Amino acid sequence: MADSKVTTASLQALLDAFNAHDVNAVMSFFTEDCVFDMPRGPAPGGRRLTGRQQVREGIQSRFDGIPDIEYADDRHWTCGDRGVSEWTIRGTQRTGEHVEVRGCDLFEFTDGKISRKDSFWKIIE
């Protein structure tokens, strides 16, 4: 992401990197001091990962936990230093349980890179 302007194409490229399960490519979109608020965790805001190393480990854990994870049915919006991606995750957890859930990511950008990613998932009951 050499350009500091964030576009929907930037968000699509990020999703493409997720779908390739390429943690290095995914991390190239993030700032050094990035924050990732995961959809699950011990607090109402989910589990917070801070800094590139924690975010990298969290993303790798997602790939490891759902080896065939795929983001599809996506739409993206940007406005200034903010962005939104809407998607459906599909895959199979290591337990054999199939996952299909609708969700979105809210993004904040600094100099064209993600400084904060806040993920939300629908709860299926």
List where the protein language model places each region:
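A solvent-exposed, acidic/Ser-Thr-rich amphipathic alpha-helical stretch
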Residues: 2-4, 24-75, 79
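Short, aromatic-enriched amphipathic alpha-helices that serve as compact interaction elements
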Residues: 3-22, 29
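Short solvent-exposed loop/turn micro-motifs enriched in small/polar/acidic residues
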Residues: 9, 68-70, 99-101
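Short beta-strand segments enriched in hydrophobic/aromatic residues
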Residues: 30, 89-91, 121
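Residue-level signal for well-ordered, solvent-exposed loop/turn and beta-edge residues enriched
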Residues: 35, 97, 113-115
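A short hydrophobic beta-strand element
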Residues: 80-89
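Exposed beta-sheet edge and beta->alpha loop/turn motif
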Residues: 88-110
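Short beta-strand edge/turn micro-motifs at domain boundaries
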Residues: 102, 106-125
